[in-house]
């Protein structure tokens, strides 16, 4: 993961992909209040652009469904290792916790 993030931070994401929609349930702990969360395009160890905005788990949990291009939904479903979830906060604006998607 680029950058140190929050060394105490922990998180868990469950991602569902349907035709034209990405849904994510997020849980984080041991970090300051989350201010943003996204799915980024990028393999392990690289930083990449935001491709899906998510609800920030500001109280530790969040659930969101975002409409996306069907092609992107297909990509996330077929090649999850090409994407990661990143949760941001004021202390770690580049990302407090990050997790690579996998099946």
Question: Residue spans of the language-model regions?
Answer:
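Metal-centered catalytic cores of metalloenzymes
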Residues: 1-37, 41-103
